[in-house]
Structures are given as structure tokens and as C-alpha cells.
Amino acid sequence: MPPSDSPILDDIKSAASELIDPVLDALGGNPWPRRLINACNAAYMISDRRLGSSLPLLEEAGMQKGTRPLVFVSGIHDVHAGFVCRTDDDGLLVTFRGTLPPEDMIFWRWAADWLHDAQTVPMPWTVGERDYGQVASAFGIAVSSLARDLLETLETLNAGSASAIRITGHSKGGAMACLGATLIREQYPDRRIEVCSFAAPMTADQDFIDCYDRDGLLARTDRFQNALDPVPYLPGGPDIRQWLDGEKRLDEAKKLMLVEDAIKALPEWPYRQFGRLHFLHEEDGRIQDDEDAERAAWDAVINAVVKMRFREMIDAHSGVQRYLTALSPDEGEAED
């Protein structure tokens, strides 16, 4: 859970400040990714069906002044959660909470969430009466359990007249954002829907991606991946197995750490990554989103494995200390 004094992003006060902001420049002047990571971090503060002391983060996320977020939860110990709020451009922001961190004050709630995430077997995904491919059951069950409350909340906030509906999440929340987007698209086919995930694991198979594309969602889906973060390669799929099989850099590691046996033992999951990748480089904070970004992200993780930088790989997944910092204009002011 992010601390109450989590580092937050500087306000975007004028067009002039945007011109000298390297993060905004790298994102084509789009302020929403940095707003959305604030929303993701705010979601970790959901407790007792409330958002507690998250107001500063929500203001940074672009929540409309004078409004309040509406929270929805489900599951044992409310392990699945999210919120919807109005934004300052008359849109709506849907945020799904990620997996609770070990620092969560309630041990059983944290344990229940992690055990739920271990359900990686595929399950069919249905939107309306349409077969929508297969998804990882942990995320499918989570979104299905929240669907009714989510759609009722959107109706309460008059989503049909929103300028845009933006959907986001960090980690598990990023996977849920993509699944939730399909249900929201079904309910609001004429609304502009944008999806942005941070550190999302692999979520769905190629049939899902094809349906997602036909619904016009793929072209408006972005995903951010931090250098060294291994979670976007979990729980695995055909692309990952193929990449691992061809990795000569792992030859020594395979001998030392039985990595080769682990690769052979990987289940044949059908999951694939999708959406436009924005890769956050470790050395200079550069944001890469060209055709070579996938390779650069993979190289960073494999090199970290070979060098046994496991502690740093765990830290790389943090929404506050890594993703927020990478998208902050003044990195020197954000705690690492």
C-alpha cells in the first residue's frame, strides 16, 4: 500500500511547462499516463470500501473538483476492488486495484489476493452473447465478480454522456482493465474508450485479442513496462517459451540454476501480450515505443536474470517507486 506521503507528480500548469517536460515530450504531450499511474496508486488505498486519504493522488489523476470517487469491491476480504471518478475533461476514469503488496496491514487479505492470482488456467470469456476467447482465470473471475457493481456505478455517473471513458490498473489491475474494457464497450458502444495498463501480466489468448481488435479497443490500448519488471511475462505463453528456447545468454544460468528444467516445466498457457508498448529504460529513463521496444524490454529482463539482479527485479514492479518515478517530470524529487 503506498504511504500517505507517496511522491506525486508536479501539476501541469501551462503549455510552456509541457514543452520543457521530457516525459510529456516523449508521450507526444499526453498528460494522461502520469495521471493514470497516480490513480493506480490511489486504488491501493481502498479499505473498508472507501479510498481514505487518497485525495492528493486523485487530484493528480485529474479527478473533477467537487466530486468524489465511487468504490466497488468483491471477493473474500474485498480482494478485488476499483473505483470510478469524474475527470476534469467531463470524462470518467475507471481504475482497478492491483494485487495487494506484502506490506498490506491485513495479512489474510494479502494472502487471499496472492492465492487467487495463482489461478492461471484459462477460462472462456463471454461478452454479451459473444465468445471472446480465453483469459487467465484469476483475472476473469475477478472482473466477473465486479462487473455488476462496475456497470451500475457507470450508469449512476451517466457514462453514456462522458467525453471519454479511461480504464487503467497496475499489475493485476492492468489485466483487469483490459477485461473490464470489453464489458464497458458492450454497454457503451458509442463512447470513446481508452485503456492504459502498467506492469500488467499476460492476460488473454489470440482469439480474445482478435475480438478486442474488432471492437476497436486494441488501437486505443497502451501498456507501460518498466525495465527489469518480470511480471509482464507471467504467467507465460507461446511467445515467451519461444524466446526462452532461443536465449543463448541463459546457457550458463541454465546450468547453474536449472533454468532449462524450469522452462520445460512451464505450462502451455495460450496468453499473449497486446496493446502498444511503452518501455521505460533503466539507464536514462527514456520511453521507447517503436518497433524495437519489445526486444529492448525482453533484453533488459533476461540480462537481469543472467546477472541475478532478483531484488531489483522485484523492486522494478513497484507502482510508486518505479512507475510513478519514471513518469514524473522531476525525478530527483521523487523517492526511489
Predicted segments with their positions:
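A residue-level signal for conserved active-site and pocket-lining positions in enzyme catalytic cores
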Residues: 39, 94, 146, 195, ...
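A conserved cap/lid and substrate-binding interface adjacent to the catalytic center
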Residues: 64-168, 185-192, 217-218, 296
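Serine-dependent carboxylesterase/thioesterase catalytic core
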Residues: 149-241
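N-terminal low-complexity, Ser/Thr- and acidic-residue-enriched intrinsically disordered segments
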Residues: 2-88, 97
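Secretory-pathway lumenal glyco-enzymes, predominantly type II signal-anchor Golgi glycosyltransferases
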Residues: 38-41, 46, 69-72, 79-83, ...
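Lipolytic serine-hydrolase domain surface
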Residues: 205-336
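Charge-rich, solvent-exposed alpha-helical interaction surfaces
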Residues: 8-11, 15, 19-22, 26, ...
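Short, flexible loop/turn elements at secondary-structure junctions
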Residues: 43, 73-76, 88, 98-100, ...
